[in-house]
Amino acid sequence: YKHPYFDDFEQEIPIPESEKNAKEKGLNFIKLDGAVGIIGNGAGLVMSTLDVVAENGGKAANFLDIGGGAKAETVSSALEVLEADKNVKSVLINIFGGITRCDLVAEGIIEATKGKELVWPIIIRLDGTNSLEGLEILKANPNEKIFIEESMDSAAKLAVQKGL
């Protein structure tokens, strides 16, 4: 902080372990009390994803923004953060590629899930930069708990259904 006296404010507010863990990984994460884990790129997209989940009768378990230009490792780290939350029943990954390349997001999903028995279904919506390549990567690495949806609304509906 520019003003050192602000340091005391941070020390007074207890931060959940999951938020500390995410911060160490360079992720913007806030724990919420729902069952649908949310991963997106950009605060606006994540907030609108929370809204669409709510419109479809669900409650978000978190706000997790991987930011712009996220690499495969970032996505893998985001999924690791959600694995620690026992309230998560499904995960919705909603990416609109601009700076963030959807093929790298897909690689991160495969990296994080390969050889693992997933504890929850992952619903993925990719759009934008290299989205077709990203979808091909996901299709080339099928997993019975990974679902691809074309729209944010259909992805949110499925995430809510799978999270019940």
Region spans (language model):
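Short Gly/Thr/Asp-enriched flexible loops that form oxyanion-binding sites at enzyme active sites
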Residues: 101-112
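ATP-dependent carboxylate/acyl-activation modules
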Residues: 1-93, 105, 115, 127-129, ...
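Glycine-rich, proline-tolerant flexible connector loops at the mouths of alpha/beta enzymes
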Residues: 96-100
